[in-house]
Amino acid sequence: MSKSDYYEALGVARNASDSEIKKAYRRMAMKYHPDRNPGDKEAEARFKEAKEAYEILSDPQKRAAYDQFGHAGVDPSAGMGGAGGPGGPGGPDFADIFSDVFGDIFGGGGRRGGGGRRVFRGADLRYNLELSLEDAVRGTEVQIRVPTQEVCDACDGKGTKEGSQPETCPTCKGHGDVRIQQGFFSVQQTCPRCGGSGSVITDPCRKCGGRGRVQSQKTLSVRVPAGVDTGDRIRLSGEGEPGENGGPPGDLYVQIMVREHEFFQRDGANLRCEVPISITKAALGGEVEVPTLDGRVNLRIPAGAQSGKVFRVRGKGVKPVRGGPQGDLLCRVHVETPVNLTKKQKELLEEFGRTMDDTGDKHTPRTSSWLDKARKFFEDWKL
């Protein structure tokens, strides 16, 4: 059975805090509690799903591994009993579920064993792919190595030694589920012995320990289309975990993450950049050379340009991956105050300042307006 995303299972964002994850789990546990939803199989499944998600996301190390590699990063075989998996001789003791009043309710549903009769699709995997802005905008092809679980070639995924066959589970009599009565509680849950398969492996394969799978890695080629951005996903069909008992494999989702750039910031289809200009260039106008992802362009600065003014270079942005017009490059200028002046430069600026004294309202209207407001403020408050 394909596993859902753990963050989606709890209804939280991927950057959710520990407290947000804990609150979300409590809310889901109360809503889908089996005692509140007797006989509701869907509620029971959601309850177990939320519990499993919380077990991973509440652990910093497991969460980091899951964020990087998805379900494979937290070891899909974890939680399977001993050498034989959930249906092997190392399976959990049936009595363990009676540890306390809520032990049966909060006990997880074991994963399906390799020797069961039911057929399930493999779990989906996720891989975080970090790209430069240039590669994201232009498109590229990269090779990635991902951890995966492959079908054991020694037993062909059956989990048993050659000549051996799974046996009917003695705990659930082949049903895959057990009902537990404890006081006022009556809970039906996945059989802890066979993990819901209805069968147990008494003579497990030595190579895979009865799981039917072995840990491995594979190299895949990923074609990244031009225009992708952080948060986009690329689906590689059939590259997830193999299915159980002959089921189809899951998919691999490549999650795009674009690194910060030295010059540009992505804003949808547009690119933004900061351009420092000198005080003389701002006052007199001129041209300044700015970079684009296609090369250099000359940006025309009109006389009297103010700091913070944004100039548009059309067609130098991003062509959206889902179609639409190409974006623009938005250049925000900042007038830079000169520093480390020579004596001569200071004298020239002082002379320039004196020529502005009588005509400031004409050349610097914002400053003159601000000074007028400040004077009025002082007069009103007699400061």
From Swiss-Prot:
Binding locations of Zn(2+) 2: 169, 172, 191, 194
> What GO biological process terms are annotated to this protein in UniProt?
chaperone cofactor-dependent protein refolding; DNA replication; protein refolding; response to heat
Chain segments carrying region Disordered: 230-249
Q: Which domain of life is it from?
A: Bacteria
- InterPro entries in the cross-refs: DnaJ, DnaJ_C, DnaJ_domain, DnaJ_domain_CS, HSP40/DnaJ_pept-bd, HSP_DnaJ_Cys-rich_dom, HSP_DnaJ_Cys-rich_dom_sf, J_dom_sf
Required co-factor(s) are: Zn(2+)
Q: Where, in residue numbers, are the CXXCXGXG motif repeats? A: 152-159, 169-176, 191-198, 205-212
Identify the residues that bind Zn(2+) 1: 152, 155, 205, 208
Q: Name one GO molecular function term.
A: zinc ion binding
**Zn finger (CR-type) location:** 139-217
This protein's record includes keyword Membrane: no
What is written about domains in the entry's comments?
The J domain is necessary and sufficient to stimulate DnaK ATPase activity. Zinc center 1 plays an important role in the autonomous, DnaK-independent chaperone activity of DnaJ. Zinc center 2 is essential for interaction with DnaK and for DnaJ activity.
Subunit record text? Homodimer.
UniProt name for this protein = Chaperone protein DnaJ
